[in-house]
Amino acid sequence: MDKPIEHYWQIRLKAVKEALEANHFEVFLAKDVGEANKIVKDQILPTLGAKSVSWGGSMTFLATGLYEEIKKMPGLEILDTFDRSKSPEENMEIRRRAVLADLFITGTNAVTEGGILVNLDMLGNRACSINFGPKHVVILVGRNKIVSELDDAMYRVKNYAAPANAMRLEKKTPCVKTSYCEDCKSPDRICNVWTITEKSFPKGRIRVILINQDLGL
């Protein structure tokens, strides 16, 4: 068999797709970030009539190239939470406004085989927007985010994704030195707000694109 790893993941991704659909998410499968990019631009955006777009911190979103492309689209109000030219106060206000965007795009820290999304935030703006506020949400998910069940998801987030992100962001937290969660009290702590999304409500509000690549942390 050619490309057995890709075939293995095709089977697993299909099963997760079915589980998410049973939980009222709309789900797409993409072979790579290029196809995920096209799904958003050609299949999702034209159906939404969105006038404002924002996003939450996501390496997977950046990997698709959508960040740069969407910013150039005419007729869209862009609430750019990644704009480093803004002051901290201005960026916080953009994040507040993003909660009411027509479309919010982000990633997820983990997704279970049973079709549950698990996220842990520093500020809570991403976790909030996934679950309430924006009219539509698109979540881009690399295959490496799939775990068996909820306990595995929380372990993955606390002891892999969060320490790795703290290192990436050069935070002054104990996990940067130990590589696992110390349940710290540091002012730099990025683990403050958990959300567990068992269902999309209303049905189809959250669209998930499962990508057959390892992406993000």
Q: Where in the sequence are the language-model features?
A:
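Glycine- and acidic-residue-enriched helix-capping/strand-helix junction motifs
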Residues: 1-9
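N-terminal active-site beta-alpha-beta segment that forms phosphate/nucleotide-binding
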Residues: 9-95, 100-105
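Flexible, glycine/proline-enriched loop segments at strand-loop-helix junctions
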Residues: 3-4, 81-84, 137-144
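Conserved phosphate- and dinucleotide-binding cores of soluble alpha/beta proteins
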Residues: 98-217
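N-terminal start-of-chain detector that recognizes signal peptides
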Residues: 1, 25-26, 76-79, 90-91, ...
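Short N-terminal helix-initiation segments at or just after the protein's N-terminus
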Residues: 1, 79-87, 155, 183, ...
